[in-house]
Amino acid sequence: MAAALLALAALPVGAAEAPLALAWRTPAGNELLELDRSRVLARGPLPAERQAPLGSLWKLFVYAYLVDRQQPDPGYQCLGHDRDEVYCCNPGERIDRDQALVKSCGLYFDPARLGVTPDDWSRYWQARSAPAWLQRLDALKPEARVPVADLLAQLQTLPAQDEARRVLLDVPLQARDAGVLATLGARLRVKTWSWLADADPQARQGGFAGWLNDGTPVWAGGPGTSQRVLGQYAEVLERTLPVSWPREPGSCVEVRLFSRYPLREVSLAGQSTPVAPGALRGRYQVLFENGNRLDIESQGELFLERRDDGLALTAHLEREDYVARVLDREAAPEPVEAAKALAVAVRTYLVQNAVRRGECLVIDDSSSSQRVAPRPASAASRTIAAWTADLVLAGSTVTYHSERAGPDRLSWQQAVTEAKEGVRYDSILARAFPRASLSRWDKPVAACQALPNAEDWLRRQRREWRPVLDAEPGYAEIPQFSVCRLASGRPHVDRERRRIFVRGLFSLQDRLDLTHEYLHLAFEAHPNGQDEAYVERLARQLLLE
């Protein structure tokens, strides 16, 4: 096995047959896997001599240094004078430290600009017994070749890694290929890297390094840019990476169980004597004032309290445990894609509706909000919660119902049907919440800044255009779509999410752009939808004649 791995490792990275190398730390030591786009080709110990270019991973170490030393964030203002600003922001815009890490903005992390001196840097990393290449600021270059084992060791103990993991969820969220997030979910918290290929300076190699969401250090490298690696290897990574409980499962959620049903007493299972208020451990039976009984189970997270209005049963849960318990109570962990969609909706409902009390979020267990299972979550639901950890929707109010769909409401029954048809969770959510975008818990940002006036205009015009459009081969009216503000670039459509990105509705050109892009959607199942000349001619006919 070791010989096979060394042979694979010796292949030029730019060669067509070169596999993706994936390394991580395990309890038994560092492990190296070699993968093609469909399977694991080889697995064995990570050779100590295995090296890779540092690429843009140097920015992760500068980020950790700045955050750990509590250095103020000076931001970076793009003025349009430096071509490397393409990795940062548009002229006139400003980027902060977290955004700079995700976008790999080297101009932000320039040590001289930040006032990081070689002596301060060296002392800081020497105190942490870092390898020599990390102690020298002048050696922290993208072309520097460093042992992969060193990278994994430093990631294991990196300062500020909790903050980095939180921020780096934006890497799959902002990936050019939407399939990365759809396939991998929230499991990878990694900084991407790219550099010149070893054997061909005209080619590229790239990958990522960081953590799985349980804190396991991970590194990957293969042919092509980092975005190409993520996109082309997402499917095999999905099958290879474990789904583990997150290292940071979220702040506490305080839930008053059975908030609408007064309690008479709580007793140990099989006994009739009521238990005293306090933390509960074991199996119990709840007797309600209406005479109904219910079995519950606690591992110390449920508390029986005596309040002015009677007995109360309160659960103190980690956020992701809360999501898993709601999933068990409101629906089921299967079909998996439907369950993933509902888990995101549950988490979003929590952040939109809970009341903050100190470090905890407070929400009732009620059919008018979200019902919570009064027992440990099933392993299957915990897996769904872990796979989607920290993912929420931004841009819409989120509700859900077991059967009824509606504006900004997810129907579990409909989600199940769509999942069985092969629809992935992100598309299930996009259909239920067309204006919303997947985002992260601590900083929900909507990718679609809705233009309601433009959407209303298009819907009105569409009714007038119907006689003309219905006569065109391949036309299919789109029942649900969103019109979003275009931040930069050319007008376009996101077919998967049914979104039209335009500048506004201020001029004739804006209206032409909006009509043109809508027609691309409406003819997407017909060759006419790919014919730019046809689409533009029809758009002008509709607007100008």
Locate the predicted segments by residue.
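Post-HExxH zinc-binding segment in Zn-dependent metallohydrolases
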Residues: 90-91, 95-99, 461-477, 526-545
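A short, well-structured edge-of-sheet supersecondary motif
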Residues: 16-44, 208-213, 217-221, 483-484
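Active-site SXXK
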Residues: 50-74, 100, 256-258
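Catalytic Zn2+-binding segment of zinc metalloproteases
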Residues: 69-70, 518-534
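Active-site-adjacent helix/loop patches that line small-molecule binding or acyl-intermediate pockets
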Residues: 18-22, 76-167
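Short alpha-helix carrying the canonical HExxH Zn2+-binding catalytic motif
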Residues: 54, 58, 506-522
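Active-site scaffold of zinc-dependent metalloenzymes
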Residues: 478-511, 524, 538-540
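Conserved, single-site charged/polar hotspot
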Residues: 15, 165-189, 197-205, 209, ...
